[in-house]
């Protein structure tokens, strides 16, 4: 299984002709393809930890699996680079007499696009394949009451014909993920199931790697964090931000690309693939941190797009910024088409610029520097 996955990663790297190293593309593909449903992130965290360990001064994980890699330990200020490791998923909730599995959602999964998909149930004895059942259109075309599916109506078929057979394979509480994997599309565009938010954990790891190459120039302590359970309530970020007590934090997540038909840009903003990362202004984003990021991007010719936040961002930034006495924080986002679907599309060129920007921010920090709103 491991060698097959590694071979696929090498094939993808050989087909990619862009700004990232082959080793980085291979890491991204392994990270995306490793299932990490909310509350069950350990397999993906191991992939992340294996990658960052060679260039970190220290690594550790906490009781729930938030995983941290530290560079320049003891430096000041203390900078946290955070991204969540989990993906939207489902969980086995009930097994009926015929052996079909009924599910509950973990995170913002859409029942309408989940029907007729291949899935994997993650059990203590290994993965079990299944499909989300779907009634053929021939059998429903004369049904005047046909409606969009609800989560409680979805069922998973694992190829058995009784509850007893099903219970030999799966248990209530086993997590379920969709089985679509990483692939290159055209140019620098890639498609996958879980770019939300493996691109973030990839970016913070890459930023740490880049910083490790010029560690002597670094005055800040940098803590790269792959945190858990964002999709079900921003839970891991609360835990690890409280533990680490950073002086400043940069959060990486995806945002909605709005450059395709049917999306109202007047309502949702104008965000495109291939036009650079997005920086959020307002809300919990500290104005001085945002201004520093803008200036650094301009000096390094990194194109930025901008989004407005009047209150919450819906990301880990929302809980990090009010931890303890308030941590100066900013959100950097990667535009993502078709978010929370099996076919999320991102630009790898956009993605490559995020660790560059975070590394530049870390290098810009002077010993003991603080970010405060000027009164």
Q: What do these predicted ranges mean?
A:
Residues 2-375:
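N-terminal hydrophobic/helix-forming segments and targeting peptides
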């Amino acid at each position: 299984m491991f060698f097959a996955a590694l071979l696929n990663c090498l094939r993808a790297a050989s087909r990619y002709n862009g700004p990232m190293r082959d080793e980085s593309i291979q890491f991204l593909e392994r990270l995306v393809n490793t299932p990490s449903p909310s509350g069950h992130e350990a397999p993906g965290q191991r992939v992340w930890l294996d990658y960052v360990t060679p260039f970190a001064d220290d690594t550790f994980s906490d009781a729930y699996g938030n995983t941290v890699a530290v560079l320049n330990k003891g430096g000041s200020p203390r900078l946290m680079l955070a991204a969540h490791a989990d993906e939207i998923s489902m969980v086995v909730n009930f097994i009926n007499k015929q052996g079909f599995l009924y599910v509950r959602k973990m995170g913002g999964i859409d029942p309408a696009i989940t029907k007729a998909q291949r899935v994997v149930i993650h059990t203590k004895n290994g993965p079990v394949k299944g499909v989300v059942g779907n009634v053929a259109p021939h059998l429903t075309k004369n049904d005047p009451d046909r409606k969009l599916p609800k989560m409680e109506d979805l069922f998973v078929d694992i190829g058995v014909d009784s509850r007893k057979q099903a219970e030999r394979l799966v248990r209530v509480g086993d997590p379920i993920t969709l089985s679509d994997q990483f692939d290159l599309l055209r140019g620098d565009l890639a498609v996958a199931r879980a770019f939300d938010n493996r691109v973030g954990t990839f970016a913070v790891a890459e930023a740490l790697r880049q910083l490790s190459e010029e560690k002597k120039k670094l005055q800040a302590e940098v803590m790269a964090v792959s945190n858990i359970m964002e999709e079900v309530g921003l839970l891991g970020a609360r835990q690890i931000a409280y533990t680490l007590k950073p002086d400043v934090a940069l959060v990486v997540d995806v945002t909605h690309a709005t450059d395709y038909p049917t999306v109202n840009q007047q309502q949702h903003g104008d965000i495109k693939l291939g036009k650079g990362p997005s920086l959020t202004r307002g809300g919990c984003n500290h104005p001085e941190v945002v201004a520093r990021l803008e200036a650094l991007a301009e000096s390094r010719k990194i194109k930025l797009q901008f989004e407005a936040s009047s209150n919450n961002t819906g990301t880990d930034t929302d809980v990090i910024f009010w931890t303890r006495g308030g941590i100066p924080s900013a959100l950097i986002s990667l535009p993502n088409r078709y978010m929370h679907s099996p076919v999320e599309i991102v630009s790898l060129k956009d993605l490559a610029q995020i660790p560059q920007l975070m590394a530049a921010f870390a290098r810009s920090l002077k010993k003991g520097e603080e970010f405060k709103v000027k009164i």
